[in-house]
Amino acid sequence: MLPIITYPHPLLKKRSEPVTLFDEELRQFLDEMYITMLAKNGVGLAAVQVGNPIRALIVNIPDEEGNQERENLLEIINPEFLSKEGEIQFNEGCLSVPEFYEDVTRFDRVRLTYQDRYGERHEIEAEGYLAVALQHEIDHLNGILFIDKLSLIKRKKFEKELKKRQRASL
């Protein structure tokens, strides 16, 4: 299992680099990301969250029973949005911002192009929860956290909670 870095780690604010080598090392890394995401009860994980600032992420939305089957796993490398439409409010959390959840406004429908673990190009259209998860993880690749999208009042609430937790852990 890979260690997850948490806010305010400076790597989380860095733009990730494109993947150019689609080799066995990358595939093994993606497998380790999947194991880590499941162990931490996540639905998505960007490579930068485990300390590797490359443009790679995984998303696995649970089914109705809460299962995250391997065949439903999306491995998204070098993503580029083609279109974004609509608006949705979604209560988000993040493995790199533990124990904090807040409503974030996102696009409701997205279309993007990406490469898979072998470098093959694909296109996907997503809406609702999947669209939100993809935007959240792609934001990580651009050095953006969901807390960066909060209103000033909600951001201050987060900073206050963070300071409180930091004092409690001393």
Swiss-Prot record:
Under the heading InterPro entries, the entry gives:
Peptide_deformylase (IPR023635), Peptide_deformylase_sf (IPR036821)
Look at the named UniProt entry and state the broad enzyme category this protein falls under. Answer: hydrolase
Q: Which reaction does it catalyse?
A: N-terminal N-formyl-L-methionyl-[peptide] + H2O = N-terminal L-methionyl-[peptide] + formate
Enzyme Commission (EC) number: 3.5.1.88
Primary role: Removes the formyl group from the N-terminal Met of newly synthesized proteins. Requires at least a dipeptide for an efficient rate of reaction. N-terminal L-methionine is a prerequisite for activity but the enzyme has broad specificity at other positions.
Which SUPFAM superfamilies does this one have? Answer: Peptide deformylase (SSF56420)
Record's keyword terms, sorted: Hydrolase, Iron, Metal-binding, Protein biosynthesis
Q: Pfam families under this entry? A: Pep_deformylase
Question: Per UniProt, what is one GO molecular function of this protein?
Answer: peptide deformylase activity
Xref: Gene3D superfamilies: Peptide deformylase
- Write down the CDD domains for this protein, in alphabetical order: Pep_deformylase
Q: Which organism is it from?
A: Wolinella succinogenes (strain ATCC 29543 / DSM 1740 / CCUG 13145 / JCM 31913 / LMG 7466 / NCTC 11488 / FDC 602W)
Record note on cofactor: Binds 1 Fe(2+) ion.
Q: Which residues are recorded as binding Fe cation?
A: C94, H136, H140
Asked if the record carries the keyword Plastid, the reply is: no
Q: What is one GO biological process annotated to this record?
A: co-translational protein modification
- Which family does the record claim for this protein? Belongs to the polypeptide deformylase family.
Cofactors needed by this protein, per the record, are: Fe(2+)
Identify which residues the record assigns to the active site. Answer: E137
Q: Which domain of life is it from?
A: Bacteria
Protein name per Swiss-Prot or TrEMBL: Peptide deformylase
